[in-house]
Swiss-Prot record:
One of its GO terms (biological process) is protein transport. This is Outer-membrane lipoprotein LolB. InterPro entries: LolA/LolB/LppX, OM_lipoprot_LolB. Keywords: Cell outer membrane, Chaperone, Lipoprotein, Membrane, Palmitate, Protein transport, Signal, Transport.
């Protein structure tokens, strides 16, 4: 069963061409985190990103707005329609996963298992924070690098494998990270366009001379 089939469907080409900001109702980061600049994504204590997610299967295709807040202990993933209506919210915190979709709440110890069970999607939510920032996990095999030693293609070792292509790169929040990724697994295709990525620091750890940078002012 796919509880997300009612999401607004648009051709995938609009995902690639869209460069506009998300709607004004975008989710704000927690108040105890402050935007900062970093010289490498690995130096970010936490981050948030906004962009687009396009999904294509053998039977269907659609796209949504994507918001992600990430720390070492917590993830908040939100999908919204093009009108800004939240249709899916996934939160993980220290071994607990909570999924809210279609007005119902589901819980599990494993976020990947929960998302697959409820939506029918096998989206790699555990690995995506690394891939979004252009990094590999210990279980990933690097297949191709570009001239700047950045990953161009990787494959996961767990069957059936995911194949990830890093199509283009960009500078955000002082660091270099992917702009467009494509993920393939059997008949499932995902494209993620990162429109905005912001490094965050816990407010009580921020040096007094650290300049603030708000995401909605970029």
């Amino acid at each position: 069963m796919n509880n997300l089939s009612y999401l607004t469907k648009i051709p995938l080409i609009w995902v690639l061409l869209s460069v506009t900001l998300l709607s004004a109702c975008s989710v704000a980061p927690p108040e105890n985190f402050i935007p900062v600049q970093v010289d490498d994504v690995s130096n970010a204590q936490a981050w948030e990103m906004q962009g687009k997610l396009a999904v294509r299967t053998s039977k269907d295709k659609f796209s949504t707005n994507l918001y992600w807040f990430h720390t070492d202990k917590k993830n908040e993933l939100t999908l919204t329609t093009m009108l800004g209506t939240t249709v899916l919210s996934l939160t993980t915190l220290e071994g607990e996963a909570r999924l809210e979709v279609d007005g119902k709440v589901y819980q599990d110890k494993d976020a990947q298992r929960l998302l697959t069970r409820v939506t029918g999607w096998s989206i790699p939510v555990d690995a995506l924070p690394l891939w979004i920032t252009g990094r590999l996990s210990d279980d990933d095999e690097l297949l191709v690098q570009d001239e700047q030693q950045r990953p161009m293609k990787l494959a996961t070792q767990n069957p059936p494998p995911w194949e990830v292509e890093f199509i283009s790169w960009q500078q955000q929040s002082g660091a270099e990270l992917p702009r467009l990724l494509q993920l393939k697994r059997e008949d499932l295709r995902l494209k993620i366009q990162i429109s905005h990525w912001q490094a965050l620091s816990a407010a009580h750890l921020l040096p007094s001379n650290q300049p603030e940078e708000r995401l909605n002012e970029q």
